[in-house]
Amino acid sequence: MLPQHSDIEIAWYASIQQEPNGWKTVTTQFYIQEFSEYIAPLQDAVDLEIATEEERSLLEA
């Protein structure tokens, strides 16, 4: 079993790009795209008023 929020860490590390000059940068667009996969279902549940209190708190965190 993976630790809580490990999928978020995976998305974060995947968004880091190695630049030709050796710098590592986070590509915001990729980061937002990855997180939208996790946020959209929670937002839909809140909008449809079927989210639990735990799900609401995850979205507000």
From Swiss-Prot:
Disruption phenotype: Produces less H(2) during fermentation on minimal glucose medium, but not on complex glucose or complex formate medium. Alters production of organic acids when grown on minimal glucose medium; complementation was not reported.
Pfam families: Caudo_TAP
Domain of life, source organism: Bacteria
UniProt record similarity statement: Belongs to the tfa family.
Function: Might play a role in cell growth during glycolysis.
Note: Encoded by the cryptic lambdoid prophage DLP12. Missing about 60 C-terminal residues compared to orthologs.
Name listed for the protein in its UniProt record: Protein TfaX
Organism: Escherichia coli (strain K12)
